[in-house]
Amino acid sequence: MNLSPKQPQNSFSNNLGLAAYSRGMGGLGLPGDLSSMSRFVRAAFTKLNSLSGSTEEESVGQFFHILGAVEQVRGCCEVAEGKYEITIYTSCFNADKGVYYYTTYNNRRITAVDMHRENLDSASLVKYPMLDKEDILQQN
């Protein structure tokens, strides 16, 4: 077994300068490894085979599920000693309605910013704080 969150080292030959072409290659051989190519293919497969509902909410939710299939989880892909690649945020935008949706690594709840609730003719920059603290809905 050679699976690891660390980048693999060339153990083939000292005379051949083999280098990893992508982060996450310590998982090569593991079904669904974390290399860029594998993640791209998995994202394409998931997008092309997923089923979405007909509402805006269902489509947005499905989008985040699709990208969740390829997100980077802290600890699985080491980029430097003690530092790991993570999916910092995921976002999509409904250009017809002017709504920007996002989640962050630390807050999985989907946040929406409706651009049409702002004065789009204003010369002032409008900014919102990124909601990056886990937001758990307490049901009872």
Labelled PLM ranges:
Residues 1-140:
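C-terminus-biased signal that marks the final domain/tail of proteins
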